[in-house]
Amino acid sequence: MKPKEVLEKWIDCFSKADAYHIAELYATNAVNHQVANDPIIGKESIYKMFVNEFATAKMVCMVENIFEDGEWAIMEWKDSLGLRGCGFFHVKDNKIVFQRGYWDKLSFLKQHNLPIE
């Protein structure tokens, strides 16, 4: 699969709040670094992160743009509450080996009435 195709599967799993299948898209030692948080290392830890996140807030990923460059897929997104962000996905052998996401954590917490850390 091309990186864009892996990202499209990721978006589908994210939209369904499917932590198991989204985690299956990551390599065993993958890193997911949402810059507002510490990096999450390893497929099992990434799975647990998504389980927790999907249980905490209803998240929506509305794609604005997807780009592909070599082993990278890049996405600009928004959600139904007006939050915007972008994600960078490094894909090797059909698995995400590194992901970095940029979004405004304070806005997210306020929109979902979550405690501000």
Where are these regions (language model features)?
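Generic alpha-helical secondary structure signal
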Residues: 1, 5, 20, 44, ...
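A solvent-exposed, acidic/Ser-Thr-rich amphipathic alpha-helical stretch
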Residues: 19-69
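Short, flexible active-site loop motifs that bind/organize anionic cofactors or intermediates
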Residues: 9-12, 36, 98
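A beta-strand edge to alpha-helix "cap/lid" segment located at domain peripheries
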Residues: 47-117
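Short, aromatic-enriched amphipathic alpha-helices that serve as compact interaction elements
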Residues: 1-17, 25
